[in-house]
Amino acid sequence: ASIAKTAVGHLAATARESFASANNDLIKGKQWLSTLDNRTTPQCRIRDRLKYTLNNKPVGHSVPYLQGPGKIHFCCRSTETFILKSAKELGIDVRDISPAERASMDGVVAGDTTYREWFLRQPYTRQKQIVGESRAKLIRDGGMSPDEFYTDKGEWLTLKQLRERDAQVFRKAGI
């Protein structure tokens, strides 16, 4: 089943690439969408809602696209949505549509909710399931942000690397 899921995700990502290429007159970029639950990988959590050009270049951040959603790791459940050119960019005089909603394991959330925002609203027990007890303590008791668990290139830091960066936050969290 895992191999089939991975193959389907890879095929879907390849189809999206072909679609975007064929419609680049309407599409100005893409946005990574990660599944909002406790099984989402660190690689996908950091990339949730990040924008990229159609050539996979970061827009407003430095986290690389790598292989992209559906291809970045085995059993990847992330996807991407296309960012359409605005009506104004297309020469049409109408009001733009606001973002809608997106799904999470708890039901519908606002369409512009990022994984980070969703994560920070979760109870401590769920945060512990997602990032582990030490990292959950670093957030709750040490005052760390989930974003601090990554390099500026989106690489997941080990606890040892985090401690080397800021031992004080570990003491504050009682770790």
Which residues does each PLM region occupy?
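Domain-core detector
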Residues: A1-H73, F82-I175
